[in-house]
């Protein structure tokens, strides 16, 4: 599933081709994704794309005729093509945004769990209304995390994956960050110390920044807009490595379902206090 670094990579990849361009048409081949594709997309002919930015795992295509909210879902990806290429349509190519200068933004989604919605202003849309701070922003601090964790009995892994606390820390990067911080994923959030919060915030920022630089993580479906895979999978420390040796201590990486998600951790480097 594309997480924050993958969405950020997609945003950076498509922006140079689209910002400042006018929309010629939006072709919707599959109107039923996670939610029905907004009918307003058919009225955006002539709209100028002002900016493309990311909020949580949503890509916002801001235009002078309203904003398009795109979520990649479980298996979605965006590619940039030229009308001149005349590339064949894949059965999973559900939406094309075509600009007047001949650029195609093509949305491919085998599992059809993504989102293409219209809003007059994205920031006031219900989907974005109750989100926590961005993890790479100055608002996400150790003091903030410590304060939010008080009286929270939920496992710390679930806690940092809660978008109301902080956005965009998905399963892969939660596992990796907790390993780097030396924190067991089942530790109750309320038991985090101020020092642990400081370390955790630091490594979350480090892990996400590194993943963005390397183009995201390619595990199953994610491909960058230029067709290249992400490379962060090559340096994963615990995620997907059940039964393998820990790179730090040599112990065997374990896996457990926490909050309906597979969680990977080192039992020695991430001890759970008794």
From Swiss-Prot:
GO biological process, one term: base-excision repair
FPG-type ZnF: 237-271
Alphabetized InterPro entries for the sequence: DNA_glyclase/AP_lyase_DNA-bd, DNA_glyclase_Znf_dom_DNA_BS, Formamido-pyr_DNA_Glyclase, FPG_cat, MutM-like_N-ter, Ribosomal_uS13-like_H2TH, Znf_DNA_glyclase/AP_lyase, Znf_FPG/IleRS
Reactions that this protein is recorded to catalyse: Hydrolysis of DNA containing ring-opened 7-methylguanine residues, releasing 2,6-diamino-4-hydroxy-5-(N-methyl)formamidopyrimidine; 2'-deoxyribonucleotide-(2'-deoxyribose 5'-phosphate)-2'-deoxyribonucleotide-DNA = a 3'-end 2'-deoxyribonucleotide-(2,3-dehydro-2,3-deoxyribose 5'-phosphate)-DNA + a 5'-end 5'-phospho-2'-deoxyribonucleoside-DNA + H(+)
Coiled coil: none
Binding-site list for DNA: 92, 111, 152
Tree of life domain: Bacteria
Alphabetical UniProt keywords: DNA damage, DNA repair, DNA-binding, Glycosidase, Hydrolase, Lyase, Metal-binding, Multifunctional enzyme, Zinc, Zinc-finger
Active-site residue list: 2 (schiff-base intermediate with dna), 3 (proton donor), 57 (proton donor), 261 (proton donor)
Gene3D superfamilies from the UniProt entry: 1.10.8.50, MutM-like, N-terminal
UniProt keyword Zinc-finger present: yes
Cofactor: Zn(2+)
Documented EC number(s): 3.2.2.23, 4.2.99.18
GO MF entries: 8-oxo-7,8-dihydroguanine DNA N-glycosylase activity; class I DNA-(apurinic or apyrimidinic site) endonuclease activity; damaged DNA binding; zinc ion binding
Cofactor note: Binds 1 zinc ion per subunit.
Function: Involved in base excision repair of DNA damaged by oxidation or by mutagenic agents. Acts as a DNA glycosylase that recognizes and removes damaged bases. Has a preference for oxidized purines, such as 7,8-dihydro-8-oxoguanine (8-oxoG). Has AP (apurinic/apyrimidinic) lyase activity and introduces nicks in the DNA strand. Cleaves the DNA backbone by beta-delta elimination to generate a single-strand break at the site of the removed base with both 3'- and 5'-phosphates.
Family indicated by similarity: Belongs to the FPG family.
HAMAP family the record matches: Fapy_DNA_glycosyl
Subunit text: Monomer.
NCBIfam families per record: fpg, PRK01103.1
Protein name in UniProt: Formamidopyrimidine-DNA glycosylase
Top-level taxonomy: Bacteria, Pseudomonadati, Pseudomonadota, Gammaproteobacteria, Pasteurellales
């Amino acid at each position: 599933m594309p997480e924050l670094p993958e969405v950020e990579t997609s945003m950076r990849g498509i922006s140079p081709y689209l910002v400042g361009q006018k929309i010629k048409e939006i072709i919707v081949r599959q109107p039923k994704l996670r939610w029905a594709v907004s009918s307003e997309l058919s009225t955006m002919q002539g709209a100028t794309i002002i900016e493309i930015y990311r909020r949580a795992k949503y890509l916002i295509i801001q235009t002078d005729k309203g904003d398009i909210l795109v979520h990649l879902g479980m298996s979605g990806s965006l590619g940039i093509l030229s009308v001149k290429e005349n590339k064949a349509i894949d059965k999973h190519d559900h939406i094309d945004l075509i600009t007047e200068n001949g650029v195609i933004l093509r949305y491919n989604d085998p599992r059809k769990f993504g989102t293409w919605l219209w809003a007059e202003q994205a920031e006031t849309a219900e989907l974005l209304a109750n989100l926590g701070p961005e993890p790479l922003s100055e608002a996400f601090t150790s003091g903030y995390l410590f304060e939010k964790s008080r009286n929270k009995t939920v496992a710390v892994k679930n806690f940092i994956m809660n978008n109301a606390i902080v956005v965009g820390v998905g399963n892969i990067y939660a596992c990796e960050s907790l390993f780097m911080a030396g924190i067991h994923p089942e530790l109750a959030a309320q038991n985090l110390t101020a020092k642990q919060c400081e370390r955790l915030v630091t490594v979350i920022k480090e892990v996400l920044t590194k993943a963005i630089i390397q183009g995201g993580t390619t595990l199953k479906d994610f491909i960058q807009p230029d067709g290249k895979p992400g490379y962060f999978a090559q340096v994963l420390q615990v995620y997907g490595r059940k039964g393998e040796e820990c790179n730090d201590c040599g112990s065997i990486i374990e896996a457990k379902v926490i909050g309906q998600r597979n969680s990977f951790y080192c039992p020695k480097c991430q001890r759970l206090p008794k």
